[in-house]
């Protein structure tokens, strides 16, 4: 849910954008880097991302990954210059997390941190921290989950398994747990 307007985020880009300070999403109307992409290319990437989002909603994570990677492959080089790369890598890492492929999630979300507006984005830090936790990398998990908590507050964790927030409370004082 977008804390600013109370609306539910309907796709991965919205979720990432509503949980980030500056969010890795941009639209042609905002005049950010996606506006610099050729309109046809922007539409193709957006359509693939939307298709991936729909597959995620249906629980078809492998199918979603195919769509997200296809969109990512369309980005011009260097891919790390594009905010679209941020939200595509975030969506890929999110799908990895839901597939319980935590090593791939860690790797892809770690790679996402090299893209614009990724560092400091609470959603990215949340998913990266969750992957680190599941892999047993507890110090790294605590660091990433704290970044997520500091940027997104306890509400960022509302729809997540309570074990992540309970774990964070063992590592830091003042963590609000349900």
Which residues does each PLM region occupy?
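Flexible helix-coil transition and linker loops at the boundaries of alpha-helical arrays
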Residues: 35-38, 75-82, 113-116, 155
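Amphipathic alpha-helical segments of tetratricopeptide repeats
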Residues: 72-75, 110-114, 149-150
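TPR/TPR-like (Sel1-like) alpha-helical repeat modules
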Residues: 133-156
């Amino acid at each position: 849910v977008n804390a600013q307007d109370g609306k539910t985020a309907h796709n991965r880009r919205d979720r990432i954008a509503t949980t980030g300070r500056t969010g890795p999403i941009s639209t042609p109307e905002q005049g950010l880097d996606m506006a610099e992409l050729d309109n046809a290319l922007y539409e193709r990437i957006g359509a693939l991302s939307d298709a991936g989002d729909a597959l995620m909603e249906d629980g078809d994570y492998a199918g979603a990954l195919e769509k997200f990677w296809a969109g990512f492959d369309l980005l011009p080089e260097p891919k790390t210059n594009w905010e679209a790369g941020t939200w595509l890598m975030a969506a890929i890492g999110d799908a990895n997390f839901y597939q319980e492929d935590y090593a791939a999630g860690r790797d892809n979300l770690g790679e996402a941190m090299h893209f614009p507006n990724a560092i400091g984005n609470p959603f990215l830090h949340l998913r990266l921290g969750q992957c680190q936790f599941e892999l047993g990398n507890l110090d790294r998990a605590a660091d990433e989950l704290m970044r997520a908590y500091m940027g997104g507050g306890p509400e960022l964790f509302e729809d997540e398994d309570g074990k992540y927030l309970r774990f964070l409370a063992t590592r830091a004082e003042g963590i609000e747990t349900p």
